[in-house]
Curated annotation (Swiss-Prot):
MF term (GO), any: toxin activity
Compartments it resides in: Secreted
Protein name: Kunitz-type U15-theraphotoxin-Hs1c
Signal peptide span: 1-27
Keyword terms, alphabetized: Disulfide bond, Protease inhibitor, Secreted, Serine protease inhibitor, Signal
Pfam families: Kunitz_BPTI
GO terms, biological process: envenomation resulting in negative regulation of voltage-gated potassium channel activity in another organism
Function description: Serine protease inhibitor that inhibits trypsin at a molar ratio of 1:1.
Disulfide bond annotation, renumbered to this chain: 37-85, 60-81
Similarity field: Belongs to the venom Kunitz-type family. 03 (sub-Kunitz) subfamily.
Length: 88
């Protein structure tokens, strides 16, 4: 049972890295920090249905968020998204 549990943990870690690493590579960095507005939309890991907003590089667009996980390019309103991400 210990080997199966270990292999499950390794598989889970591998999947998480495959999902997270490309998103980090596509993000822009400013002062060594990730610019959250450049991250791709990420619906997260759960199956709930929350209408949220993400910045697509030009404007804020609706998407469905599952309620857990995802990244920080996620805002409760279009106004909050534009305030954080739109360049004046």
């Amino acid at each position: 049972m210990g080997t199966a549990r270990f292999l499950s943990a390794v598989l889970l870690l591998s999947v998480l890295l495959m999902v997270t690493f490309p998103a980090l590579l596509s993000a822009e960095y400013h002062d060594g920090r990730v610019d959250i507005c450049s991250l791709p939309p990420d619906s997260g890991d759960c199956l709930r249905f929350f209408e949220m907003w993400y910045f697509d590089g030009t404007t804020c667009t609706k998407f469905v968020y599952g309620g857990y996980g995802g990244n920080d390019n996620r805002f409760p309103t279009e106004k909050a998204c534009m305030k954080r991400c739109a360049k004046a």
